[in-house]
Amino acid sequence: MVAVQGTEDPFYYDYETVRNGGLIFAALAFIVGLVIILSKRFRCGAKRQHRQIPEDGL
């Protein structure tokens, strides 16, 4: 196949930009995950209250 000059390949990707975007997305997802996990573990000193299931409610 002969490539026609003056036309750009529509499937050419700037892999450095794609890689940097992926790394930024992965870092943000990791940080959000840590925040979610730590926010459930530390409740600012609040004691956990367990719900009691009434025996007749089953």
UniProtKB/Swiss-Prot annotation:
Gene3D superfamilies: Single helix bin. The chain crosses the membrane at residues 20-39. GO terms for cellular component: membrane. It is found in: Membrane. GO terms for biological process: positive regulation of sodium ion export across plasma membrane; potassium ion transport; sodium ion transport. Regulatory subunit of the sodium/potassium-transporting ATPase which is composed of a catalytic alpha subunit, an auxiliary non-catalytic beta subunit and an additional regulatory subunit. This is Sodium/potassium-transporting ATPase subunit gamma. The gene is FXYD2.
